[in-house]
Amino acid sequence: MGQKVNPYGFRLGITTDHVSRWFSDSTKKGQRYSDYLAEDVKIRTLLKTSLDRAGVSRIEIERTRDRVRVDIHTARPGIVIGRRGAEAERIRADLEKLSGKQIQLNILEVKNPEADAQLVAQGIAEQLAARVAFRRAMRKGLQGAQRAGSKGVRIQVSGRLGGAEMSRSEFYREGRVPLHTLRANIDYGFYEAKTTFGRLGVKVWMYKGDITNKELARVQANVKPSRERNDRPRRGGRGSNAPEASTVPAAAGVEA
């Protein structure tokens, strides 16, 4: 299970949080859950396309009644802001045109790009697109992540490696990467490299330690207990061995 599932979704509410924060129960067109979800996808697609070289690690979206707040976590904030903020204004105008709402754009710098799995995956993909040998690019990313203080790193590259006819996958791993441990803080990143031989997929897992017992207890306290099935009365009918209760009151016995 832990080897296949996305580490973010697997640990949602334990070590990770939602990247879109809003609520909708309206049935009006333009305010439905599906409308907001489709709008989020369009916003992320637009930003990833226009900021392909800006080293975007994460995009967070938060909504109020008449405003959308977009937080862009990037390793190169100068590219996103542009000269005298011209690029940021252009991005804000494009987002307002797309959503039809007021956009609050926040640009946040990632202090340590080598400790961010998404940025490491993007860096390896850029090297592969520049015809760097895939093993060399993987080792370079592995060494940088270890220097940044990660307790364990796993990097996997899949596709027509080296221009081979048959696609395959290769990975390097250093340290521990416990994907089954829910309390393990696993950072995950994925990026595609576009080469002359086709696309290569790059995946990066980083293990940054476990959350403490106090933090785990606080998370578990916030989770509502599941509803027990035993508190409901059993229904009779087919498959039920319990005798049906008689609705006729029992007659009182009289001793002779």
Swiss-Prot record:
It comes from Leifsonia xyli subsp. xyli (strain CTCB07). This is Small ribosomal subunit protein uS3. Residues 225-234 have a biased composition (Basic and acidic residues). One of its GO terms (molecular function) is mRNA binding. Binds the lower part of the 30S subunit head. Binds mRNA in the 70S ribosome, positioning it for translation. GO terms for biological process: translation. GO terms for cellular component: cytosolic small ribosomal subunit. The keyword rRNA-binding applies. InterPro entries: KH_dom (IPR004087), KH_dom-like_a/b (IPR015946), KH_dom_type_2 (IPR004044), KH_sf_prok-type (IPR009019), Ribosomal_S3_C_sf (IPR036419), Ribosomal_uS3_bac-typ (IPR005704), Ribosomal_uS3_C (IPR001351), Ribosomal_uS3_CS (IPR018280). Residues 43-111 form the KH type-2 domain. Part of the 30S ribosomal subunit. Forms a tight complex with proteins S10 and S14. Belongs to the universal ribosomal protein uS3 family. Keywords: Ribonucleoprotein, Ribosomal protein, RNA-binding, rRNA-binding. Residues 221-256 are annotated as: Disordered. The keyword Transit peptide does not apply.
